[in-house]
């Protein structure tokens, strides 16, 4: 919003143009507020684009130099655990030039950045480019989208459809209706973003079925990096996230007063925003007798050694026990029915003890925990199928007491 457009106290700007934010609560949008420093300054800030998890903001800042020339650069900032935005920095020296870079658009894949520039080699005027995030977090050299998308005229404001197939942009090229016109085109395969899948659901109280605003995160199991960290809607408990396809993820959900929820799953086939994968999440209140299956705890086959992929889940258990210091729990180990009962009982006991030992090593008092192996005595699924046996091979923690 710009100064001449919004001059009331609620939307007063710090400079010629500022960024503002409003959040959706239930089916309505809340108050509009200025994003303040360090995002907004006395300069010109505009053209925002959020990452799919809402935690990284890309925008354009224009600063007028001593020669009177206004130069536009693309900046980025991240929101921390304290809900404060970091000091904005240049998105990349490979992207920003001595010319103008603007009209930034980060695709929901969080890996493909489209922008407009007159500082990179092009067809003339403003051209549209793309850059891709590299495994180390840096950006590739920008690639010009080429003719006939770019011409000797100005092209800008590219938006790419969620499935990455269609692009929409503005241009003042010859043959239009005058000034800027809107155009649509099909992106070549080489210029498309990474295939993504949309997932939605609702977080709710397992007893009352009332919606809950809960924090959730999705972790790429291969890299162990958090790819989404957000909160379900305050009014409806609903969430919608976008994730790269062809990967395995751990889902963790937590809210004060409730047991946390965890699950692992794999996304193979891209699903559109209009037909997303649905995962509703019931949260159980903290009380004696309630248990949680630790779905992201992994052991070597037929062994009781914890695999490195288990650390993300175990850190959630540690955080839960640290926050809820009056809770006492039992760590239970369970197996399928393959093998002798004696062998399964022994293996499950050692696996439960391995988790117990890890938690003690992380500073959780041993007096608050116990461990026990149950072998195949408490199946939660039919052992006749591999899928059922996989569900029965599990680690649980159960609340046995809540001290007053």
Residue ranges and their predicted role:
Residues 1-202, 206-207, 247, 270-276, ...:
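Short, conserved micro-motifs composed of acidic
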Residues 71, 207-224:
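Short, ordered, surface-exposed loop/turn motifs in non-cytosolic proteins
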Residues 117, 122, 324, 332-404:
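Periplasmic OmpA-like peptidoglycan-binding domain that tethers envelope proteins to the cell wall
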Residues 222-238:
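Short, acidic Ser/Thr/Gly-rich low-complexity loop/linker segments typical of extracellular
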Residues 237, 247-257:
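A short, solvent-exposed beta-strand micro-motif common in secreted/extracellular proteins
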Residues 240-243:
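Short, flexible loop/turn segments at beta-strand junctions in immunoglobulin-like
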Residues 256-280:
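Structured interaction patches on ligand/partner-binding surfaces of diverse proteins
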Residues 286-327, 335-346, 401:
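Short, solvent-exposed beta-strand/turn patches at coil↔beta or beta↔helix junctions
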């Amino acid at each position: 919003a710009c100064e001449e457009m919004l001059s009331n106290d609620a939307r007063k700007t710090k400079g010629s143009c500022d960024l503002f934010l409003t959040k959706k609560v239930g089916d309505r949008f809340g108050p509009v507020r200025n994003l303040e420093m360090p995002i907004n300054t006395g300069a010109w800030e505009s053209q925002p684009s959020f990452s799919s998890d809402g935690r990284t903001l890309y925008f354009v800042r224009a600063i007028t130099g001593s020669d009177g020339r206004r130069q536009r650069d693309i900046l980025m900032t991240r929101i921390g655990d304290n809900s404060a935005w970091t000091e904005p920095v240049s998105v990349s020296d490979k992207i920003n030039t001595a010319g103008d870079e603007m009209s930034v658009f980060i695709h929901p894949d969080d890996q493909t950045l489209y922008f407009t520039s007159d500082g990179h080699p092009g067809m003339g005027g403003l051209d549209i480019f793309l850059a891709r995030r590299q495994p180390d977090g840096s950006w590739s050299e920008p690639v010009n989208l080429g003719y006939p998308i770019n011409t000797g005229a100005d092209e800008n404001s590219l938006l790419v459809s969620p499935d990455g197939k269609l692009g929409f942009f503005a241009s003042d090229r010859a043959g239009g209706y005058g000034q800027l016109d809107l155009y649509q085109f099909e992106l070549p395969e080489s210029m498309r973003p990474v295939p993504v899948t949309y997932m939605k659901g609702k977080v709710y109280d397992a007893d009352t079925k009332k919606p809950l605003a809960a924090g959730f995160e999705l972790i790429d199991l291969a890299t162990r990096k958090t790819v989404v960290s957000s909160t379900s809607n305050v009014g409806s408990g609903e969430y919608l996230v976008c994730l790269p396809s062809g990967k395995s993820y751990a889902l963790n959900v937590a809210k004060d007063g409730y047991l946390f929820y965890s699950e692992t799953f794999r996304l193979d086939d891209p699903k559109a925003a209009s037909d997303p994968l649905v995962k509703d999440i019931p949260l159980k209140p903290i009380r004696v007798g309630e248990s949680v299956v630790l779905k992201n705890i992994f052991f070597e086959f037929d062994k009781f050694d914890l695999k490195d992929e288990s650390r993300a889940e175990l850190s959630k258990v540690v955080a839960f026990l640290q926050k809820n210091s009056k809770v006492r729990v039992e760590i239970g180990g369970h197996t399928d029915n393959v093998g002798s009962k004696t062998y399964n009982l022994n293996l499950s006991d050692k696996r439960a003890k391995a988790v117990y030992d890890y938690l003690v090593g992380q500073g959780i008092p041993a007096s608050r925990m116990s461990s026990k192996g149950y072998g195949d005595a408490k199946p939660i699924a039919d052992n006749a199928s591999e899928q059922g046996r996989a569900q029965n091979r599990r680690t649980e923690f159960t609340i046995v007491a809540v001290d007053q």
